[in-house]
C-alpha cells in the first residue's frame, strides 16, 4: 500500500484513500485502486496503469542499465523480503495477535474465529508454496537478513537507490523498509535492519518529504 501511495505522490496525482481489508480486494491483497470506474489491483500493475494513462515515467532520467537494476531490486524486495515479512507477521503467534488477527475484528462473532484461522491458513499455504515457508524460522531470518544487507549495500551513501532523486523503486523500498522497521512487530530481521543506519535514514528521508506529521508525532 505504501509503495502505491508514494508512487502517486511522486507522480503528483491527486488521490483519496479508503479503509479496506485484503480479503475484500479483487486479488485478495492490497492495494487496489479505482480510477474513473476502472479497478486496478497489484501495485506493479497500478504503476503501469498510471504511467500509461497519465503519460508519466517514474524512472525518468534513468539509463537502460539503471532501469534494469531498479527492476532487479524490486524483484528482490517483493519476491523475497516481502515473504520474510509475511512470515514474521502471520506465522509467529505473538506478531499475528498484534497485527493481522485484527483484520477480522469487525466480522460477526459467529464466523470471526473460523474466518481468521482460515485466512491465516491460506497465507501460510501461500508462504510454503513460495518456498520460503518451507524453511525453519532461523533460516528465514538469515535469508531475510541477506536481502536487508544487499539493499543497504546497493543504497550505500546515496540519498536514493539510483541517485540523488527518487524513482519508482524507491517507493517499493520505502514501503518494505518502513514496514519492516515498525517497532510494533518483534523480529531479528527488524533488529538487523535497524543496525543499518543508511536504511533508517532512507526511511526517515521519505517520511520527512511525504509524511512530515508522522515524524513530528514520533518525536
Regions from the language model: what does each represent?
Residues 47, 51, 71-74, 78, ...:
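Non-transmembrane alpha-helical segments in soluble domains
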Amino acid at each position: 500500500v505504501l509503495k502505491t501511495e508514494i508512487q502517486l505522490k511522486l507522480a503528483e496525482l491527486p488521490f483519496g484513500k479508503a479503509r479496506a481489508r485484503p480479503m475484500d480486494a479483487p486479488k485478495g491483497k492490497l492495494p487496489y485502486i479505482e480510477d474513473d470506474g476502472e479497478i486496478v489491483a497489484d501495485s506493479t500493475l497500478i504503476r503501469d496503469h498510471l504511467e500509461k494513462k497519465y503519460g508519466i515515467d517514474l524512472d525518468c532520467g534513468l539509463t537502460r542499465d539503471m532501469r534494469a537494476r531498479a527492476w532487479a531490486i524490486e524483484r528482490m524486495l517483493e519476491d523475497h523480503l516481502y515473504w520474510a515479512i509475511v512470515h514474521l507477521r502471520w506465522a509467529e503467534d505473538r506478531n499475528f495477535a498484534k497485527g493481522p488477527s485484527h483484520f477480522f475484528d469487525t466480522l460477526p462473532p459467529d464466523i470471526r474465529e473460523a474466518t481468521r484461522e482460515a485466512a491465516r491458513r491460506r497465507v501460510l499455504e501461500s508462504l510454503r508454496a513460495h518456498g520460503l515457508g518451507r524453511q525453519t524460522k532461523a533460516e528465514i531470518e538469515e535469508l531475510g537478513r541477506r536481502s536487508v544487507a544487499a539493499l543497504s549495500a546497493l543504497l550505500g551513501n546515496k540519498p536514493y537507490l539510483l541517485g540523488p532523486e527518487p524513482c519508482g523503486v524507491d517507493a517499493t523500498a520505502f514501503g518494505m523498509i518502513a514496514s519492516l522497521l515498525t517497532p510494533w512487530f518483534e523480529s531479528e530481521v527488524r533488529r538487523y535492519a535497524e543496525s543499518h543506519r543508511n536504511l533508517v535514514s532512507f526511511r526517515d528521508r521519505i517520511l520527512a518529504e511525504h509524511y512530515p506529521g508522522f515524524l513530528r508525532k514520533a518525536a
